[in-house]
């Protein structure tokens, strides 16, 4: 099991990239609330560690060349955010399934993956887009799926 901070980091990365891709090429303010969830500061004005890590995940994405932005909005987000060329190409690339939930064949075997033979080639290709695999991983709620897709994006070179 991965450390919870790493799992949160991967989820923050996935959500941020998904939001930015959906708005590409528009530049807009991306708030930590959208990435890490709504959080109210405590009586000292400090946010939760999860919220803070969401903010620093956005900064990390910029430092590593996946996004660009004009400025930070306190510790609440980044202004004029947009995907970089590198991130856009990685997210719009076609990839064999990065992670697929196995389906149950019978009680003894859990080996068969979701079939694709009855789908049209265009639907299969659309499902193979990295961004769509990431969206499916986020919808599934599976930390393992999100982690695998984000690692594929971060570690795979063009």
Describe each region flagged by the PLM.
Residues 106-158:
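Short, cationic, amphipathic peptide segments
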Residues 4, 46-49, 71-79:
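Short acidic, glycine/proline-enriched loop segments that cap or flank alpha-helices
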Residues 59-75:
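A short, conserved structural fragment
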Residues 79-122:
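Short, amphipathic alpha-helical interaction segments positioned at domain boundaries
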């Amino acid at each position: 099991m991965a450390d919870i901070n790493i799992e949160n980091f991967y989820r923050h990365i996935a959500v941020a990239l998904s939001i930015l891709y959906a708005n590409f090429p528009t530049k807009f303010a991306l708030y930590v609330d959208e990435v890490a969830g709504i959080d109210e500061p405590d009586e000292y004005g400090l946010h939760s560690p999860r919220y803070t890590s969401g903010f620093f995940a956005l900064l990390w994405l910029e430092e590593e060349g996946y996004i660009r932005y004009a400025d930070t909005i306190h510790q609440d987000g980044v202004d004029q955010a947009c995907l970089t060329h590198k991130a856009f190409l990685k997210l719009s690339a076609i990839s064999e399934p990065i992670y697929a939930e196995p389906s149950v064949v019978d009680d003894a075997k859990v080996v068969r993956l979701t079939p694709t033979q009855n789908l049209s080639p265009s639907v299969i290709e659309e499902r193979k887009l990295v961004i769509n695999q990431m969206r499916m991983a986020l919808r599934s709620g599976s930390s393992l799926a999100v982690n695998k897709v984000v690692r594929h994006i971060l570690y795979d070179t063009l």
